[in-house]
Amino acid sequence: MEEYKAVEEAAMKFVKSVTEGDSRYAKELFIDQAVLFGYLDGQLEHGSIEQFYKNVDSVGADAGFRARVDVVAVEETLAVVRVLEENWGGRIDFTDYLLLLKMDGQWRCVAKAYNQNSDTIQKQK
């Protein structure tokens, strides 16, 4: 149970960054080589986690944002976390999956994949 709590606490850095619109907390969670994959408003985003940092910092905080962290699985050095996000940027709902590895005694995120709920997509013009 201790490891589940440690994984949850690590994932909360992700939530805190999105809540406050400040990527500095997420930068403590993600390794520099972390990758992301998912669709934002119908456009595929993939590549460096830097894109996530830019999105968080440019959208900023929203008082209506809510999130829930579910620790799906924990093994000795591997964990999977689901994060449900509501009202990011005042309009978007996401389901994120974070893949964490225990590195040098700390849970660090190596990959983020996400789905934007279809009823919150704004197509690019």
Task: Name each region found by the language model.
Residues 24, 28, 43-44, 73, ...:
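Flexible domain-boundary/linker segments
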